[in-house]
C-alpha cells in the first residue's frame, strides 16, 4: 500500500504560488501576509514580489477573493493559491453573507480547477480576535502557507509528478511546528 502525504522533499525552486489578499481590514491582512511570507521563505520559496515564485494580487475585500483565485487557478501557473482576508462581525448581517460566500467561493475554486486553494480568511467577532490570530498570539498566515506547501506536494504526488517519499530523512508536514506560535 502506498501512503501519500505532503512533504518538503520536492525542490522548492519548482513551486509557484499566488497569494490573493483582501485589502479591507489591512491592519490584519498585512500581518497574515507577513506570516505567510515568513513560512514560505523558511521553506526555500523566493517571496520577492519581483521574483518568479510568488505572485501577489490585492483585491478590495474578502468577497472579491474567490473570483480572482479562480482566474489564477484557471491559468494553470500555480501549484497552490493562498487566499487571505479578515471579516469582522459588525451589527448587521453583512458579516454572515460575506463570510459564507467567500468560503463557498474559495472551496468551489479548488473543486472546479483541481488547484489547491487555501482558505486563509479570518472570520472573527472582534478586531482583537483577528489581531490575536494574525500575530499577537500566533500568526495563522504561517499555517496557511504551510497548508499550501503541503497541498502542493500532495497534489503533485497524486498527479504522478512526484513520487511518494518513503525515507525517514524528511519530516512529514504533520510533524512540523510553527515557530510563530508561543506555547
From Swiss-Prot:
Gene Ontology terms describing biological process: riboflavin biosynthetic process
CDD domains noted in UniProt: Lumazine_synthase-I (cd09209)
Binding of (2S)-2-hydroxy-3-oxobutyl phosphate, residues: 133
Molecular function via GO: 6,7-dimethyl-8-ribityllumazine synthase activity
GO cellular component: cytosol; riboflavin synthase complex
Classification via SUPFAM superfamilies: Lumazine synthase
Residues reported to bind 5-amino-6-(D-ribitylamino)uracil: 24, 62-64, 86-88, 119
Keyword 4Fe-4S attributed: no
Active site: 94
Enzyme class per UniProt: transferase
The keyword Transferase belongs to this UniProt entry's keyword annotation: yes
Keywords: Riboflavin biosynthesis, Transferase
Enzyme nomenclature, EC number: 2.5.1.78
Role of this protein: Catalyzes the formation of 6,7-dimethyl-8-ribityllumazine by condensation of 5-amino-6-(D-ribitylamino)uracil with 3,4-dihydroxy-2-butanone 4-phosphate. This is the penultimate step in the biosynthesis of riboflavin.
Similarity comment: Belongs to the DMRL synthase family.
Protein name: 6,7-dimethyl-8-ribityllumazine synthase
Originating organism: Crocosphaera subtropica (strain ATCC 51142 / BH68) (Cyanothece sp. (strain ATCC 51142))
Amino acid at each position: 500500500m502506498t501512503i501519500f502525504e505532503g512533504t518538503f522533499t520536492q525542490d522548492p525552486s519548482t513551486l509557484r504560488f499566488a497569494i490573493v489578499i483582501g485589502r479591507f481590514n489591512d491592519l490584519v491582512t498585512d500581518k497574515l501576509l507577513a506570516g505567510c511570507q515568513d513560512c514560505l521563505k523558511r521553506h526555500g520559496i523566493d517571496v520577492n514580489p519581483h521574483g518568479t515564485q510568488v505572485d501577489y494580487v490585492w483585491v478590495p475585500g474578502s468577497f472579491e477573493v474567490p473570483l480572482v483565485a479562480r482566474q489564477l487557478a484557471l491559468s494553470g501557473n500555480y501549484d497552490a493559491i493562498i487566499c487571505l482576508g479578515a471579516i469582522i462581525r459588525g451589527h448587521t448581517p453583512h458579516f454572515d453573507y460575506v463570510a459564507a460566500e467567500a468560503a463557498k467561493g474559495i472551496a468551489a475554486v479548488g473543486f472546479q480547477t483541481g488547484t489547491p486553494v487555501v482558505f486563509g480568511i479570518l472570520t472573527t467577532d472582534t478586531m482583537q480576535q483577528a489581531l490575536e490570530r494574525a500575530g499577537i498570539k500566533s500568526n495563522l498566515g504561517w499555517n496557511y502557507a504551510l497548508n499550501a506547501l503541503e497541498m502542493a506536494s500532495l497534489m503533485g504526488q497524486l498527479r504522478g509528478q512526484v513520487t511518494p517519499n518513503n525515507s525517514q530523512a524528511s519530516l512529514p508536514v504533520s510533524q512540523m511546528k510553527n515557530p510563530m506560535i508561543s506555547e
